[in-house]
């Protein structure tokens, strides 16, 4: 899906009920991988610092990843009941995460047959690279991508968290239609 279509999609998704629809919305808001969202635990969320800390063992790069949480993401979490350890636990199998096909099923029910959950990460990447002034390394860090250049990676010890927060606020503003925060779009 092209990034320009994501705001309309998110408005339609907001009308959908169910844990899988909420998980999909959270995944799009955070540009996370679907497995990271499906396995998300309440204990990983630091509400005071407004961040989600994904443990290394659940990350593709095997390195802990801190995800800045926007108002939209926090509001979505506030709507969830924390009756189990998992944020997006299965309604069918209590105590288990939603299935790996559950978010894809939401897309199919919305007649978005050519769209994949992972494609929203591509939409985020395209939007950030084409329409904002955020540096490439901030965008790649938001996607939890490893630096390909080993020499560059050896010196990159920080995670650019504050800059990534600005990026995620701008993304949330775009896809939720929150014009109050669009001032961050080009302030990298």
Question: Where are each of the predicted segments found?
Answer:
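Short coil/turn helix-boundary motifs
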Residues: 13-17, 30, 80, 132, ...
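Basic, Lys/Arg- and aromatic-enriched nucleic-acid-binding interface segment
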Residues: 1-40, 48, 59-63, 94, ...
